[in-house]
């Protein structure tokens, strides 16, 4: 069973980067995100209103796997700063991870 992680990502495009490269990476990023969603690695993704960052629920076998085989495969990763917080279910979580017994 994969573990869950809260991942905050801020992407900063280096000054002077060719706009065509930016557009190509963004297009590739969208494709890769769909692939990671299909495998269950990307659960949810949000963008705070008025901010150029994302907050997501990501899944992987462990944190090393999350970095090496998930986040590091993102085309925009070289321009990202990433903060990862491992998560576990809260005893009062009403979600399906804690079915009534």
Residue ranges and their predicted role:
Residues 1-101:
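Conserved, structured core segments of small domains
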